[in-house]
Amino acid sequence: VAPAFIGRDARELETLVNDVYVYRSNYKYQGTPFWNCVAYLEASLFDMLGRAAGRSVGDLIGGAWRSEIPIYLSSMRRDTTPEEEVRWVGERLAETKAKAVKLKVGGRMRNNEDSVPGRTERLIALARRTWGDGLTLYVDANGSYDHGKAIEIGRQLVAHGYAWFEEPCPFEQYEETK
């Protein structure tokens, strides 16, 4: 995607982003990998424009809304027992003082099974019981479930006060995700 930006006026950012989609038939490569590349270039151009103007990127796009951004701790592990995961994440929480945690659930990409049998259901309850209501909890299933299992897990998450359920069904299955 970079060649579509070379030699062009960075101040015309909206036009550049629109044009890159059709440049050399880039539209054939639509999807996350393509748009991630565009986003990296767009962020770099915003940074360059801000430096040239001696202003923050926030100022360039209408003013900063906050001076601090809350972070969450994200675990990428699925091969642990709930007890191992809560202990490991708890150590990271003590180090980082994060106010939220995102845990991995399911077996990844729709097989309705955990890598450790029963892990998801036990982890959902154990994490909330261990950390209480003062910590915001999220889960990411990476498309682990069909719609029936996703609804079942979603109800457990609601019952335990989780804030979000990321990608319960495979992302390309729009009907099941509804």
Model-identified regions with their sequence ranges:
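Generic structural "secondary-structure junction" signal
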Residues: 3, 7, 59-63, 67, ...
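Metal- or metallocofactor-binding catalytic centers and their adjacent structured scaffolds
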Residues: 1-52
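Generic hydrophobic, aliphatic-rich segments that mediate packing or membrane embedding
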Residues: 1, 16, 37, 41, ...
